UniProtKB/Swiss-Prot annotation:
GO terms for molecular function: arginine decarboxylase activity. Specifically catalyzes the decarboxylation of L-arginine to agmatine. Has no S-adenosylmethionine decarboxylase (AdoMetDC) activity. Pfam families: AdoMet_dc. The record marks E73, S74 as: Cleavage (non-hydrolytic). It comes from Pyrobaculum neutrophilum (strain DSM 2338 / JCM 9278 / NBRC 100436 / V24Sta) (Thermoproteus neutrophilus). Binds 1 pyruvoyl group covalently per subunit. SUPFAM superfamilies: S-adenosylmethionine decarboxylase. Is synthesized initially as an inactive proenzyme. Formation of the active enzyme involves a self-maturation process in which the active site pyruvoyl group is generated from an internal serine residue via an autocatalytic post-translational modification. Two non-identical subunits are generated from the proenzyme in this reaction, and the pyruvate is formed at the N-terminus of the alpha chain, which is derived from the carboxyl end of the proenzyme. Its cofactor is pyruvate. The active site is at S74 (schiff-base intermediate with substrate), H79 (proton acceptor), C94 (proton donor). The keyword Lyase applies. This is Arginine decarboxylase proenzyme. Its EC number is 4.1.1.19. Pathway: Amine and polyamine biosynthesis; agmatine biosynthesis; agmatine from L-arginine: step 1/1.
Amino acid sequence: MQTTTQVKTPVVGKHVYGELYGVDEELLRDQEKLRKIVIEAAHIAKMHLVEVNSWKFKGGDKEGVSVIALVLESHIAIHTWPTYNYATVDVYTCGEHSDPMAAFRYIVSQLAPKRFTVNYSDRSYR
């Protein structure tokens, strides 16, 4: 009797996320510009774009824009708070071929914060 052994390949999850401070208030309100930035970030990071959705929220100090790109590998998200000149960025990918840090760096270069934090989490199964 012949036995077949199935080899499991690891799930490669890479999560890059951070906070951006001191970003231009008008840029953080510009829904179309933010959408274009997210789409270009997906291309730069070698991700396969499935769909992009965005929402503009109004209401005092809680106004802002959220842009979420569903990519074949997972997602890219930007959430903004213009009143605070603040944004959060989240880039998560599965697979070895995409580069979430490249997407994050591109987004930071386009939003030009006065300062930012970046975090990396290896979310791989071993």
